[in-house]
């Protein structure tokens, strides 16, 4: 065991070899390297697999022995101060290492085919391997200084990967937005690190916890307000990195990068870094009740905000991004209420489910691009999808499993972890628990909305010219966006409404009917889009992805089905498969000290309510979006709403519009930041520029000009005649004497 731990330092550096070798080969022999570029996927996967096997061995030893191993070596700067570097192997490190490597391997295999035609293939794999190195270095860090170093490397890699297609202005702006937003959190993190060093005199976790808890808190040796401020600054770094309110605005824009990047960022790397940091520092935070309250409050706000912002999104990746934001809020809420085990459990289950969903969305986008075009506004638009079950059955099945898992449907992975958080939240605050339960229903609604719009009904790619640029309401805004498409004349009656040219949130439009050419059911023969080229008339339609893209989906689907088993707790008298509790053995177990059958009974009771809420959300999504273009019964359902009392109907429409506008416009938070912060900073910069140009430069330039004219004047006065000099001298002396005598006369 000791020998295994001694070689644990290689964990972060093994994937770095790929980045270094690719760079070296491109430098020495660029042409040959580019010609055989796809061969580099093999060493990238192989080296990360070695790290995965090594991490698994360490994890097994952690389960059996529950030991912590730390190795440090010092870099002395002065006799009074030295920096220590090394690695820390404990249950949290082993969990994160396995998570990063397993998801990373699946993403690398998937990317080989997904990025095969991209000119930046080699650059992509170099960035990805370096990203894995940075994240593995972060989770093995034994102190705050080393964490900060790798924390910044993670941020740099995310900047490079989000802006991978940097020639697209929208991608370039997105990576800058992510970078600047995270600067706010990183600045807070650095100040917090320095503040706690000032308090404790150490950067090491173990020393930090012991000194802070024993010597400082108990003896009141420092100002508690200062300690709270430093802890809040540390937490601010996690808020930015894990896209918590109010620093969440970068996350949906990060979808401008390639889809495999989105899967890695949202599942196991960047956004997980913030959760990891709070989990690592939880013994510190738990000694400051105010900080725990702030963490739980930020978490519950993010849970609800992320879910509401996902309701009306049309971009499939942005919908998943807001879903990630909401689920990260659940994890932060769990950490804030002290439920360490539940937070890490949900981090594990969510990582595999969300990686499955993102890679599934990449498969969908990959299939839609030849049909609707390569612009993300079309290929990622759920408006133009639908009916993909027929063409992509494997992708559909895996995506469906991921959707059910995220909805919290048993026995899939996220059910066990989410319900544990819901169960623990009741013990902390009933208000937080009610919000968390309500959000579980919203999660089921928007996830099934996404699934139904993508896979059910019929293919809608032929409506790509009606994607929301006109005023009338053909389809509901929940599908088409803020403005519907033009009504087309003829046979079919679809109900629409005219309310200042704004559409409703659901399929339930009420007044004014328009006839549309042909019943949509007759469009079955038009599933494909026809394109003309020089030689032939080619029929294009969606198709299933290649095996190298399907293989990771199937593996992640297996994880989604069974990874929840590691944390199921049945009680000792029934059955015990709770590997996670044996693995973690955390120092704080506020809710899992003595688990009994009564606890299991409470869990089942809460699970019944949460699953019922989830099924209600699924039912509501099915009513509003299920087979919307192929089932005639849906028309009767829509028209039945017209029988509602007019006042109630108007009130309902107003409520629906408010919800839609809030969701579609991202809660107006981006608009607020744009007007208050961005424009404010720009105006301040312009004011500073104007002051510098007119005042600072004016004074210096004025002195120079005055000196010039003074010199010119003196030059013309001096003509070389001694008599003129004597006259000037006597005149000056006379003036001085007159002033002197006049001053004495007055006194």
Swiss-Prot record:
It catalyses: a plastoquinone + NADH + (n+1) H(+)(in) = a plastoquinol + NAD(+) + n H(+)(out); a plastoquinone + NADPH + (n+1) H(+)(in) = a plastoquinol + NADP(+) + n H(+)(out). One of its GO terms (molecular function) is quinone binding. Its EC number is 7.1.1.-. It is a multi-pass membrane protein. The chain crosses the membrane at residues 8-28, 39-59, 89-109, 125-145, 147-167, 185-205, 231-251, 259-279, 281-301, 328-348, 355-375, 397-417, 426-446, 550-570, 608-628, 726-746. InterPro entries: NADH_UbQ_OxRdtase_chlpt_su5_C, NADHpl_OxRdtase_5_subgr, ND/Mrp_TM, NU5C-like, Proton_antipo_N. It is an enzyme of class 7 (translocase). GO terms for cellular component: chloroplast thylakoid membrane. Pfam families: Proton_antipo_C, Proton_antipo_M, Proton_antipo_N. Keywords: Chloroplast, Membrane, NAD, NADP, Plastid, Plastoquinone, Quinone, Thylakoid, Translocase, Transmembrane, Transmembrane helix, Transport. This is NAD(P)H-quinone oxidoreductase subunit 5, chloroplastic.
């Amino acid at each position: 065991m000791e020998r295994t731990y001694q070689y644990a330092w290689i964990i972060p550096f093994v994937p770095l070899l790929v980045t270094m070798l690719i760079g070296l080969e491109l430098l020495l022999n660029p042409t040959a390297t580019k010609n055989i570029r796809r061969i580099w996927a093999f060493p990238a996967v192989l080296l990360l697999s070695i790290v995965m096997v090594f991490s698994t061995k360490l994890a097994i030893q952690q389960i059996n022995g529950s030991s912590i191993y730390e190795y440090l070596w010092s870099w002395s700067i002065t006799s009074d101060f030295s920096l220590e570097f090394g690695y820390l192997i404990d249950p949290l490190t082993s969990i994160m290492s396995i998570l990063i490597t397993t998801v990373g391997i699946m993403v690398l295999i998937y990317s080989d085919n997904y990025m095969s035609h991209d000119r930046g293939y080699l650059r992509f794999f170099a960035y990805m391997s370096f990203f894995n190195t940075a994240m593995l270095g972060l989770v093995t860090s034994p102190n705050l200084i080393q964490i900060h170093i790798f924390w910044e490397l993670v941020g740099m890699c995310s900047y490079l990967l989000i802006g991978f297609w940097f020639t697209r202005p929208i991608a370039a702006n997105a990576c800058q937005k992510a970078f600047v937003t995270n600067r706010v959190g990183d600045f807070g993190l650095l100040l917090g690190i320095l503040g706690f060093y000032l308090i404790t005199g150490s950067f090491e976790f173990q020393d930090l916890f012991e000194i802070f808890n024993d010597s400082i808190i108990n003896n009141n040796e420092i100002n508690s307000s200062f300690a709270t401020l430093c802890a809040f600054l540390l937490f601010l770094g996690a808020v930015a990195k894990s896209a918590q309110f109010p620093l969440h605005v970068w996350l949906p824009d990060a979808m401008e990068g390639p889809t495999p990047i989105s899967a890695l960022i949202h599942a196991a790397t960047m956004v997980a870094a913030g959760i990891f940091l709070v989990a690592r520092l939880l013994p510190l935070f738990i000694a400051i009740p105010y900080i725990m309250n702030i963490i739980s409050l930020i978490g519950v706000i993010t849970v609800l905000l992320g879910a509401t912002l996902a309701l009306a999104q049309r971009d499939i990746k942005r919908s998943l991004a807001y879903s990630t934001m909401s689920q990260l809020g659940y994890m932060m809420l769990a950490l804030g209420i002290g439920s360490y085990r539940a937070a890490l459990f949900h981090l594990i289950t969510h990582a595999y489910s969300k990686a499955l969903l993102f890679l599934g969305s990449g498969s969908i986008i990959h299939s839609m691009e030849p049909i609707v075009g390569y612009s993300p506004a079309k290929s990622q638009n759920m408006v133009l999808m639908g009916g993909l079950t027929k063409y992509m059955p494997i992708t559909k099945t895996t995506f469906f499993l991921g959707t059910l898992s995220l909805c919290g449907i048993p026995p899939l992975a996220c059910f066990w972890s989410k319900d544990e958080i819901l169960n623990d939240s009741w013990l902390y605050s009933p208000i937080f628990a009610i919000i968390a339960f309500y959000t579980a229903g919203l999660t089921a609604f928007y996830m099934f909305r996404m699934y139904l719009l993508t896979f059910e009904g019929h293919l809608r790619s032929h409506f790509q010219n009606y994607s929301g640029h006109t005023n009338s309401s053909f389809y509901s805004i929940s599908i088409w966006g803020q403005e519907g498409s033009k009504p087309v004349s003829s046979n079919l009656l679809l109900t629409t409404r005219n309310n200042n040219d704004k559409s409703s949130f659901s399929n339930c439009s009420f007044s004014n009917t328009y006839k549309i050419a042909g019943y949509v059911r007759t469009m079955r023969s038009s599933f494909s889009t026809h394109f003309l080229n020089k030689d032939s008339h080619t029929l294009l339609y969606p198709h299933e992805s290649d095996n190298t893209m399907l293989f990771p989906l199937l593996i992640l689907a297996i994880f989604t089905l069974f990874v929840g088993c590691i944390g199921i707790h049945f009680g000792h008298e029934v059955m015990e498969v709770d590997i996670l509790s044996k693995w973690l053995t955390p120092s704080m177990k506020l809710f899992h000290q003595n688990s009994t059958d009564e606890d299991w009974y409470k869990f089942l009771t809460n699970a019944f309510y949460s699953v019922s809420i989830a099924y209600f959300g699924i039912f509501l999504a099915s009513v509003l979006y299920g087979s919307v273009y192929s089932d005639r019964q849906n028309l009767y359902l829509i028209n039945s709403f017209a029988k509602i009392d007019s006042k109630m109907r108007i009130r309902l429409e107003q409520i629906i519009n408010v919800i839609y506008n809030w969701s579609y416009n991202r809660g107006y938070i981006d608009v607020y930041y744009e007007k208050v912060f961005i424009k404010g900073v720009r105006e301040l910069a312009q004011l500073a520029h104007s002051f510098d140009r007119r005042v600072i430069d004016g004074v210096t330039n004025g002195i120079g000009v005055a000196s010039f004219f003074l010199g010119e004047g003196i030059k013309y006065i001096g003509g070389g005649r001694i008599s003129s000099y004597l006259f000037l001298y006597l005149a000056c002396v006379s003036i001085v004497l007159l002033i002197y005598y006049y001053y004495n006369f007055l006194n």
